[in-house]
């Protein structure tokens, strides 16, 4: 980032919404599963042992912040991470959490 160049407030507001969405364990579990590929609500529900209504609710929140996207496949909705930036953000957060002493002090 250039010196004296600040990110605009609207963008920072969107960033806070992204971090709010990421602050839930079940949403992170869903996103980590989607890191391996696309999945339906039923598959996510079964794999993570969560109710389908809870999975659908969490996906709606993740979709509202553009962390996941969906497409129709027959009668099912198939979900995936929105783009490579989301995948990178998730991987970096997991790496940061699993290596707490790399930053010094």
Language-model regions, residue ranges each:
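Residues within the DNA-recognition helix of helix-turn-helix
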Residues: 58
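Amphipathic alpha-helical dimerization/coiled-coil segments
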Residues: 1-10, 14, 85-105
């Amino acid at each position: 980032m250039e010196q004296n160049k600040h990110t605009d407030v609207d963008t920072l507001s969107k960033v806070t919404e992204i971090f709010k969405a990421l602050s839930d364990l079940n949403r992170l579990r869903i996103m980590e599963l989607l890191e391996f590929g696309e999945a339906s609500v039923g598959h996510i529900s079964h794999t993570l042992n969560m109710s389908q209504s809870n999975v659908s609710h969490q996906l709606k929140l993740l979709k509202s912040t553009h962390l996941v996207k969906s497409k129709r496949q027959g009668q099912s909705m198939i979900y995936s991470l929105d783009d490579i930036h989301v995948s990178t953000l998730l991987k970096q957060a997991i790496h940061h959490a699993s290596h707490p002493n790399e930053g010094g002090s």
